[in-house]
Amino acid sequence: LRLRRKSTTLIFEERAFPLLRIWHHWEKGGGLAAQTTDGAIRGEGMVKKATETKTTSSPAVGTAAEASPALDKIWLKSYPKSVPHEIDLSKATSIGDMISNACRQFTDRPAFTCMGKDLSYKDLDENSRGLAAWLQSRGLVKGDRVAVMMPNILQYPITISAILRAGLVVVNVNPLYTPRELQHQLNDSGAKALVVLENFAATVQKSLASIHVPNIIVATMGDMHGFKGHIINLVVRKVKKLVPAWNIPGHVRFKDALAQGRGKSFNPVPVGNSDLAFLQYTGGTTGISKGAMLSHTNILANVEQMQLWMDVAFQNKGKPKELNFVCALPLYHIFALTVNAMIGMKLGARNILIPNPRDIPAFVKELQKYPFHIFPGLNTLFNALMNNDEFKALNFKPLILTLGGGMAVQRPVAERWQQMTGCHITEGYGLSETSPVASANALDATEFSGTIGLPMPSTDIVIRDDDGKDQPLGEVGEICVRGPQVMLGYWNRPDETSRAIMPDGFFRTGDMGFMDENGFTKIVDRKKDMILVSGFNVYPNEIEEVAAEHPGIVESAAVGIPNEHSGEVVKLYVVRRDPNLTEEDVKSFCAQRLTNYKRPREVEFRDALPKTNVGKILRRELRD
């Protein structure tokens, strides 16, 4: 079986799929067209760059039912009654227009709050227009890429709003990148400008010899805080010493760029819904990161899908006039980017920005200041918060929605959260390549399901084997997604695009799972994280969920290690809550709940587990 599995994989990788995306091109006279990896739309004698194409309505990217047999969409029978099966993007234009509309409609409302300072929609409008004008004055034109390297501070939404309104493309950069990682992303994207917080400017300085970015704008933590900003900068630089010495010749200060831009005229740029909006880099935890090309349609579709989904909760629990989102996940990550920033602006909500969510006491102090209604997060964050005594004392009555994503939500964590807050965690699923939300549990549910829910409106999910054949209900295979939120492809990587997106438009997620008879999908694990014990598939998530039930364990991570008899065995890394917990205690606990081949053969205790900046556990580092 293992040999057959390897051979079919090799055969599949040798196939060439020149047709990467299929959709109906809705322009007058348009027909069946194909999106190729160079960004051109080709079909029926027309050749246009995606960045030059205007459509009167959204191309149904990835929804090409005509390219494959009709699906039995069994999930529709489980849909909330008020949620339509399909979304209407006929009036969608661009993200910049969405932001402009929000600024007009919600002028005096706070859009973002950080460290006690409100940024109203009027402020967002004026500042982003000024920065957009400045970028245009530096010679940046439609389609140019601008990198953004900042945590959750007020300058972030100003910057991405300016970029998008100027018809440019946002390249989100993890501020904790090393010089090597930063060089790769800037060079790969061909960024013409970089906006960076001074805390990370030293990394940029170390990269200068290997990059060519003509415009570098440097922000400070206190830029948007008036006189208080001087005190903030003093504390950050001198007291906490969070700003290493740096020197970037020719850089421009963020405040100076804003001031200069206000004196210039901003020229609105016509942007089509199929134009690029984001290069969202992904895959950095598994190899060289690559840019997922997300169009304005991709993001707007996901905003529309999630808004329809969230309306169910508002219908059941009410919707306050001024809605507050907790924004603890980094905005450069696709989850917070769409669910917090984009949906928040569409709804006229306030996002409470948390620059450093790992500082749990400071995080909780911010939560004490405001009623919070929408709380996106991930398993490790929820777990860490519930171990804080002051968090337990917060007023949770206003909480309408808790949205879990980014990694599997463990049932013990979900049950404890519901008991503590009175609000269950609604788990969803997605990736950078799907903008990100592909599926979610219904928001009128009253308890945690342990699944990733139902496909979003206008979205199809199938389970396929290594040969690309659909699996029957209940059978494990790779989760594949098709819908208007699925990316155009990987930037300058046609081979990887053709491997990831099948001819019928389905995107291979790399996650293993199955669909039940009601259309709910359950993830069993990442394909690459699967452990093979004597020919049996073992999924780390299952072992970690069992370990999470032990009162003496804070968190754990399961990996496979070589074994001469069984090929691999399970090793469990554990962070203890109970200092007296022993290896035998853990093994005995697991033995009562797991069949023999799934049980950990080794247990190693750690003070902490390696994680990404978003909080995902890095199993790869533990394996290495």
Task: Please report, for each region that a protein language model flagged, where it lies by residue.
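Conserved AMP-binding/adenylation subdomain of ANL enzymes
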Residues: 300-324, 332-373, 388
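Conserved AMP-binding/adenylate-forming core of the ANL superfamily
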Residues: 87-91, 100, 108-153, 157-161, ...
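AMP-binding/adenylate-forming catalytic core of the ANL superfamily
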Residues: 177, 184, 194-198, 470, ...
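Conserved structural elements of the adenylate-forming
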Residues: 125-130, 259-264, 273, 292-317, ...
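Gly/Ser/Thr-rich phosphate-binding loop
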Residues: 349, 369-376, 386-447, 460
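Conserved AMP-binding A3 loop
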Residues: 120-122, 268, 277-304
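ANL superfamily adenylate-forming
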Residues: 76-77, 205-273
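Conserved pre-ATP/AMP-binding loop-to-beta segment of ANL
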Residues: 107, 245-281, 288, 313-324
